Amino acid sequence: MNPSRIRIKMCGMTRSEDIQYAIDLGVDAIGLIFYPKSARNVSLEKARIIVNNIPPFVDIVAVLVNPEQSFVQLIINEIPVQLLQFHGEESSEFCRQFNKPFIKAIHPKTAIQIQSAVDEFFDASAILLDTPSDKERGGTGLTFDWNIIPENLSKPYILAGGLNESNILEAITMCHPYAVDVCSGIEASPGVKDHLKMSRFIKAIWG
């Protein structure tokens, strides 16, 4: 896959100025985390404000971890999200009930676990591969083990887990993902993006 066609999602946004800078850089999607245990959590009230000026063709992705059905529906009703991203132990039945395109994040340790998720979540828009962690649900800064990704997966996958300006080109060249998802690798602190790191990340991919 040509690195110039890699789709890019910047996740864990909490500030309007960071979202605007990401848009100016040409990213494809913005991730908002609706999970109170996350340092990057945003309230519905704040989310309404910071997504206000996002233009067409930049997707808003709501990132959720084992949410209540009613909370997901509230987000759909209140925020103009294009995609839901489930980062917990949600079942395929739970994910599909909202009639909204969704991404299922998994934290696999083996190729078999990846293939099993692709089979189970057959109607997901994509599978997101993130680093296993006993403490955090994404945003750990730990690099995913690229060697366990099976060849010729039948579903598009998004590569996450410890991506930054130093390793992103190697990751793309080795893994050929449909898209990449970066969070801690472009931050000054959790939820606060570093604009220099953001621009360097993009430059590493697109030149």
From Swiss-Prot:
Recorded superkingdom: Bacteria
Protein name, entry field: N-(5'-phosphoribosyl)anthranilate isomerase
Pathway, per record: Amino-acid biosynthesis; L-tryptophan biosynthesis; L-tryptophan from chorismate: step 3/5
Please tell me the species this chain comes from: Legionella pneumophila (strain Paris)
The entry's keywords: Amino-acid biosynthesis, Aromatic amino acid biosynthesis, Isomerase, Tryptophan biosynthesis
Family note: Belongs to the TrpF family.
NCBIfam families linked to this entry: PRK01222.1-4
- Gene Ontology BP term (one): L-tryptophan biosynthetic process
Catalytic reaction list: N-(5-phospho-beta-D-ribosyl)anthranilate = 1-(2-carboxyphenylamino)-1-deoxy-D-ribulose 5-phosphate
Isomerase listed as a keyword = yes
Q: InterPro entries given for it?
A: Aldolase_TIM, PRAI_dom, RibuloseP-bd_barrel, TrpF_fam
Q: Which HAMAP family match?
A: PRAI (MF_00135)
E.C. designation(s): 5.3.1.24
Tell me if Magnesium is a UniProt keyword of this record.
Answer: no
Task: Quote the gene name from the UniProt entry.
Answer: trpF
What is the enzyme's main class?
Answer: isomerase
GO terms for MF: phosphoribosylanthranilate isomerase activity
Instruction: Name a Pfam family for this protein.
Output: PRAI
